[in-house]
């Protein structure tokens, strides 16, 4: 059915002028009228027409826009251009070069024109040159996001809504929209609107004067009078869960212009609304590939999406009720247990993973960067759910990458030099660690990686950058990500007869870069095995964790809370400095006496600081407290105990009471009163992984032996 586009334009005008929504007090709020006033005064550039609003007024017009988007974009733009003078209440203060250029031309033309001749002087200017705004459509909420491979020939020219992951982003460059030429003979100006990616510049002057005199004036391009717009090309690829069995993920080129540029980075999950169009080939390529045509998506709206759900990346604050739900008592245990609730046990491992998601605080004293991100290595026997924990963290983190050891080369992890198909230049393409910037990079089967590829990670784990010198490109890329690695011991299973170094077989330089190295052993234990088997069979039957008193938190809620925690920048107070120093010296002393311990260096102290600041962030506090340091020390101690296994308990004194006694004895000052504060002794023992009940039992036992006395107020332990 043929359409009268003039009446359609009038409909567009009516909608822009008359559409309103009632606010809370019942007052009419003209949504687009306010935006038109902002555009008229140059306070706003992009105007987004929400098709849900238009559907309330005229559903037929919405269908027409979705079918023939390019035409209606121009109709709406013309309607806005005609309406702008009504909304202009004052002169624009800051004029750009094009304003001055056009005003000057209008004045020159009025002087040289016959006063009796009635003619609109702006007619000769193309509408694209006069527009100072961009117009885009926002797809109706009823339209479902499509997969890249479902966008086919029947979608050409229509408004489509697709989801995918950005794999490549070009630099933003100026793109010519209107070319302005000046004649060297008559001085007349000629304008050439450009629609396609390439164009043939005009050479001969088409003005009446040159045609009459046959002077053959030549045209020269005036860049000051031409109009340019920002242009960027994205490559998006469909999600791995959208790819059919045995197929390779499909890609699509997206052309982004104006205000939509610089919104996405490689690795972002995005939803794009745009017009699906064929690419017009000209020149030599048309001769070579005359029958083939490329397609692309002209972007109208680009939003970042969550990784696993279809909703936009929520930046809204948590409500008070949601905060109360999270921060009730035992919230630390509750948050940790909400990580992979289907997996049984591993409470301390989950706590460490929670701290990895929150992260510590970055420090940059005088340009030297001390990282805040926490790196964790999970090592263990086969079948202890290491990979499941990794894949859950990959889904939970707002920004993450998942790779495996054998499937990743050093270049694939860091950066590769590629040839740009558009310009032919050599460009850098970021690998998994660059794509996971400000997020988490999960590397499974870490022990299976080639040594040459593993060395690529060393710089990232401490300096958080990737330095490149390839193909004439010398640069440094940011890779501020936490690394979560999972590895199997050297002999398939952990061999208790071998030392820790022989079992792990990773270089000390790499091990010291991991803040927490956790060994998860699969030891036979009847009660534990029974509970685990019941848990697994229930999960297998019902596809959810067994019912319990504890209700795990929703993944979306956790993601928003973690984002909120990351905004905090807690500092370590002066009062805790001595306590931390003493604790570190104690750890070094213990490492010296126990030959089988992991490598303890100054990085271990930094690890404690990172874990402490992450715990303070989790409580939404600005200052680190003693409890945070004790919990950080406890986690470090538990991870070391996991490495020592049975050997550790035999190498130490057998009973916990004896270890607690030696710990308290070491706290006694060499000179002065032979007494220790009760609270300090308890904190030191708890930080070493003992429970308060074990501490109390040891006190009573040695008090009966008359080794020490505890006063009635239980504030002081005095040695006899």
Swiss-Prot record:
A zinc finger (C4-type) spans 183-210. Pfam families: HTH_MCM7, MCM, MCM_lid, MCM_N, MCM_OB. One of its GO terms (cellular component) is chromatin. ATP 2 binds at residues 513, 603. Its EC number is 3.6.4.12. It comes from the Eukaryota. SUPFAM superfamilies: Nucleic acid-binding proteins, P-loop containing nucleoside triphosphate hydrolases. Ubiquitinated by traip when forks converge following formation of DNA interstrand cross-links. Ubiquitinated via 'Lys-6'- and 'Lys-63'-linked polyubiquitination by traip. Short ubiquitin chains on mcm7 promote recruitment of DNA glycosylase neil3. If the interstrand cross-link cannot be cleaved by neil3, the ubiquitin chains continue to grow on mcm7, promoting the unloading of the CMG helicase complex by the vcp/p97 ATPase. It catalyses: ATP + H2O = ADP + phosphate + H(+). Keywords: ATP-binding, Cell cycle, Chromosome, DNA replication, DNA-binding, Helicase, Hydrolase, Metal-binding, Nucleotide-binding, Nucleus, Ubl conjugation, Zinc, Zinc-finger. It is an enzyme of class 3 (hydrolase). Acts as a component of the mcm2-7 complex (mcm complex) which is the putative replicative helicase essential for 'once per cell cycle' DNA replication initiation and elongation in eukaryotic cells. The active ATPase sites in the mcm2-7 ring are formed through the interaction surfaces of two neighboring subunits such that a critical structure of a conserved arginine finger motif is provided in trans relative to the ATP-binding site of the Walker A box of the adjacent subunit. The six ATPase active sites, however, are likely to contribute differentially to the complex helicase activity. Belongs to the MCM family. This is DNA replication licensing factor mcm7-A. It comes from Xenopus laevis. The lineage of its organism: Eukaryota, Metazoa, Chordata, Craniata, Vertebrata. The gene is mcm7-a.
């Amino acid at each position: 059915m043929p359409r009268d586009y003039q009446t359609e334009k009038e409909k567009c005008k009516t909608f822009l002028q008359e559409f309103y929504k009632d606010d809370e007090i019942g007052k009419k709020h003209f949504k687009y009228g306010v935006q038109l006033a902002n555009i008229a005064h140059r306070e706003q550039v992009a105007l987004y027409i929400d098709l849900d609003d238009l559907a309330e007024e005229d559903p037929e017009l919405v269908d027409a826009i979705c079918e023939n988007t390019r035409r209606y974009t121009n109709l709406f733009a013309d309607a806005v251009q005609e309406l702008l003078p009504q909304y202009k209440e004052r002169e624009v203060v800051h004029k750009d070069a094009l304003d001055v250029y056009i005003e000057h031309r209008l004045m020159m033309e009025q002087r040289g024109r016959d006063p009796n001749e009635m003619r609109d002087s702006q007619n000769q200017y193309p509408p694209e040159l006069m527009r100072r705004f961009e117009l885009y459509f926002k797809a109706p909420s009823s339209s479902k996001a499509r997969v890249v491979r479902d966008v086919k020939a029947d979608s050409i020219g229509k408004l489509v809504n697709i989801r995918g992951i950005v794999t490549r982003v070009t630099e933003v460059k100026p793109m010519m929209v209107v070319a302005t030429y000046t004649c060297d003979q008559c001085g007349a100006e000629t304008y050439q609107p450009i629609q396609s990616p390439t164009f043939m510049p005009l050479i001969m002057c088409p003005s009446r004067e040159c045609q009459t005199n046959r002077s053959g004036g030549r045209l020269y391009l005036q860049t000051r009078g031409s109009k340019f717009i920002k242009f960027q090309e994205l490559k998006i690829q469909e999600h791995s869960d959208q790819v059919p069995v045995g197929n390779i993920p499909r890609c699509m080129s997206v052309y982004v212009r104006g205000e939509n540029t610089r919104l996405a980075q490689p690795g972002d999950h995005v939803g794009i609304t745009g017009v699906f169009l064929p690419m017009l080939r000209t020149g030599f390529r048309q001769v070579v590939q005359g029958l083939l045509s490329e397609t692309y998506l002209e972007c109208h709206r680009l939003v970042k999406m969550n990784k696993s759900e279809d909703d936009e990346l929520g930046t809204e604050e948590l409500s008070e009720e949601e905060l109360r739900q999270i921060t009730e008592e035992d919230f630390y245990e509750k948050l940790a247990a909400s990580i992979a609730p289907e997996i049984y046990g591993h409470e301390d491992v989950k706590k460490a993973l929670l701290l990895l998601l929150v992260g510590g605080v970055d420090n940059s004293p005088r340009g030297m960067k001390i990282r805040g991100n926490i790196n964790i290595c999970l090592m263990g026997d086969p079948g202890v759910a290491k990979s499941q924990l990794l894949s859950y963290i990959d889904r939970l983190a707002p920004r993450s990458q998942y790779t495996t050891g054998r499937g990743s080369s050093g270049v694939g992890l860091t950066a590769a030099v590629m040839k740009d198909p558009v310009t032919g230049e050599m460009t850098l393409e970021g690998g998994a660690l660059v794509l996971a910037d400000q997020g988490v990079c999960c590397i499974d089967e870490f022990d299976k990686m080639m040594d040459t590829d593993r060395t690529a990670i060393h710089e990232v784990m401490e300096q958080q950058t990737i330095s490149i010198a390839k193909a004439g490109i010398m640069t440094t890329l940011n890779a501020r990500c936490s690394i979560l690695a999972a590895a199997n011991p050297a002999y398939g299973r952990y061999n208790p007869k071998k030392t820790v170094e022989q079992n792990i077989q990773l270089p000390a330089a790499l091990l010291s870069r991991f803040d927490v190295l956790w060994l998860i052993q699969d030891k036979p234990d009847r009660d534990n095995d029974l509970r685990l088997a019941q848990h697994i069979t229930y999960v297998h039957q019902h596809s959810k964790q067994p019912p319990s008193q504890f209700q795990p938190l929703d993944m979306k809620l956790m993601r928003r809370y973690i984002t909120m925690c990351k905004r905090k920048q807690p500092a370590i107070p002066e009062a805790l400095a001595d306590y931390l120093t003493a604790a570190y010296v104690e750890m070094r002393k213990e490492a010296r006496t126990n030959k089988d311990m992991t490598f303890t260096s100054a990085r271990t102290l930094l690890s404690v600081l990172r874990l402490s600041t992450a715990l303070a962030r989790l409580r939404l506090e600005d200052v680190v407290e003693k409890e945070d340091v004790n919990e950080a020390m406890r986690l470090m101690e538990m991870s070391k105990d996991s490495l020592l296994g049975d050997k550790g308990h035999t190498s130490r004194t057998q009973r916990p009471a004896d270890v607690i006694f030696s710990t308290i004895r070491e706290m006694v000052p060499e000179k002065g009163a032979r007494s220790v504060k009760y609270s300090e002794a308890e904190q030191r023992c708890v930080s070493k992984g003992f429970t308060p009940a074990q501490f109390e039992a040891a006190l009573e036992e040695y008090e009966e032996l008359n080794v020490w006395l505890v006063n009635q107020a239980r504030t002081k332990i005095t040695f006899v």
